[in-house]
Amino acid sequence: MNAPPSRLKFHTDTDLAKGLKALFVELQARLELRDKPIKATIAGGIAVHLYTAQRVTMDVDAEFGARLYLPQDLGIEVPGPGGRSLWLHFDAQYNSTFALMHEDYLDDAVRVPLGVDYFDIYILSPVDLAVSKISRLSANDRGDIAALVEHGLTTAAAIEARARDALPGFVGNVRPLEMNIADAVEIARQAEKRRSTA
């Protein structure tokens, strides 16, 4: 199960989301973009934030549909927790091939109406976003998977099925990955229980 795009609600009115829009606006100004919009697909914590409004992050994991130069000094200051400022910036080292990704992740990404003229901005679907967290499965990744499930955006069964479908395309040793899948599915199941009793 994955929430259909028509039912998805995006939190585009938060300080972090407004900062994300400003970051893309600044990038298109720096690059002097004037042609048709370039597709940008966002993963990571900022995508989780757009779905849940819970996650706070400073780096933007974005994959572009064209080769772009990302200025190293490009960033936007946004209010963060406790009144401290965050420097929101693109992660120039982001590479989706390091994560577990289903072969259809770009096709199934969901458009976010941020209102940026020369970027067509998408985020990973909830289930693909959860699956992308599995290869590393840090504390933040675990929390992100739980948050997506607790918000009713995906399920343990959907995550397991999508992750197993993605395994043949993973570059590297899949044995640790299979253990991570089992852990991620258990995290999702526990989140489902919390959701059902909330």
Question: Where would I find each of the regions flagged by the language model?
Answer:
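Compositionally biased terminal segments of proteins
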Residues: 1-198
